[in-house]
Curated annotation (Swiss-Prot):
Homodimer. This is Aspartate--tRNA(Asp/Asn) ligase. It comes from Chlorobium luteolum (strain DSM 273 / BCRC 81028 / 2530) (Pelodictyon luteolum). Aspartyl-tRNA synthetase with relaxed tRNA specificity since it is able to aspartylate not only its cognate tRNA(Asp) but also tRNA(Asn). Reaction proceeds in two steps: L-aspartate is first activated by ATP to form Asp-AMP and then transferred to the acceptor end of tRNA(Asp/Asn). It is found in: Cytoplasm. One of its GO terms (biological process) is aspartyl-tRNA aminoacylation.
Amino acid sequence: MTKEAGELNALKNRFRTDYCGQLGLDGEGREVRLGGWVHRIRDHGGLVFIDLRDHTGICQLVVQPEREELFELAGRLHAESVITIEGRVVARSSETINPRLASGSIEVVVSAIGVESHARPLPFPVADEVQTSEELRLKYRFIDLRREKIHENIIFRSRISAAIRRYLEERDFIEIQTPILTSSSPEGARDFLVPSRLHPGKFYALPQAPQQFKQLLMVAGFPRYFQIAPCFRDEDARADRSPGEFYQLDMEMAFIEQDDLFEILEGMFRHLTDTMSKKRITRFPFPRISYREVMDSYGTDKPDLRIPLKIEDVTPMFTDSGFKVFASNTKPGCAVKALVLKGRGTESRLFYDKAEKRARELGSAGLAYIQFREEGPKGPIVKFMTEPELQAMKDQLTLETGDVVFFAAGKWEAACKIMGGMRTYFGDLFTLDPDELSFCWIVDFPMFEYNEDAKKVDFSHNPFSMPQGEMEALETMDPLDVLAYQYDIVCNGIELSSGAIRNHKPEIMYKAFEIAGYSREEVDLRFGHMIEAFKLGAPPHGGIAPGLDRLVMILRDEQNIREVIAFPMNQQAQDLMMAAPSEVTGAQLRELHIRLDLPEEEKK
């Protein structure tokens, strides 16, 4: 544990006068009291050395054999027992200085030991961070949290939360807590429901996000709102998503445009990175990429811009081609996409077989490619192409001998996504700088999309976003061409948040829902309280809600979100430490007027 991670102002009492990680040569000769956990014990031929650990770090204790009772007691201590000691700070000899410890220039010669708590043998060691199953780590999370790396992750999370609060309060944001018990919404993920004892048959829902409350705060006249809000969604776990609950930095501002919000967020992320991390932001202000452009060039709306590959559109090249597979995908709504790997045209057959396997996993029927070798172009589709077509391709894509180009063809979105998946797959060929933070904004999302299953126009993302062009756009444009004031912020391929400038004008909202097939009565039934509020004086407003868990993950170089949460659930949405979820008594259910109707397999 580093001094930086756990620096404290000493609280002097009968247990301690100082902290382990903060002792140094400036304390030489002082009598001190320390309290903490036994990290390691070593018997070195007549001297017992104890590594004592507290929140700030480790300090080496020395127990001398002349003090027989102390020496005997020290020899009986187990790792992770909690002790308090008294002793004198002495300088280490030059050959015994430990540069890995903040207190490595001193040690404490012990004059008294008090055992506050004997520790039984642990389910896994703390001092030696051996590989331990996640199930065991989560069951004994209070022990796992003693380990240095995860302990520092939780400290870092606390400090970044405090830094966010300071930053926003300096910019006139007001922290407001919104309700945890609210009403269920049919949109989005599944709700966690809470039965009401006072209102039998009715349920509260835990909020998936404080979305409606924060917009109503704008209507209430609060100009800038934020909170670090718990959110609850009954959804499956992923490496970057915790099941059940997560925390987000929820923000909303009145009388703003999109650029105003971008300026606030970019400044905050730069401040946090510069002051709390060794990482660096490569481009500032953050690049802004339209949804159409990001799909065309990166095949995903969550691009990792560190990967030095871009997708090229080669559709016009195949309009009159004799290669019918590609020619048939040059009509409107379709595309032929290409991805060039420089200098990889001589890879083994296994390289291409693995790439094709990945393409099939992404939904492609196969993976067409052309290698440009010394002896000429090679590959499964070369025989279908003419010399002029091959030369035109070399010219457009600036191909050289030794390069290889991969293709995907089909509906525009499908072709983009397949090439985007291959871009990420080939990203492993490059050494990406883990300290580089490549942020970008994805903007200009389409307001509507065509729902193939329902055979109708539907909202593509957030139905409450303001359409670009407002009412005029809705009344005069093809719905599929209308763009929304929606935006995502992405870093290194991870989406940190979505946000939008909200639609605060009821007539525009009614019109947008009408295009998506909803009557005015349906809109009033579902969202009447919001529309009623907007009819009583609503300012233009917009917001965003970056995930705190994901932000800490990125800044701490963690691949799994459970490493930055103090008490996470496992992937089956279970808290193994607290044995949740659990059964409740029949009396509790009767009080709530609930009768269980379990699936057959659960009854056994």
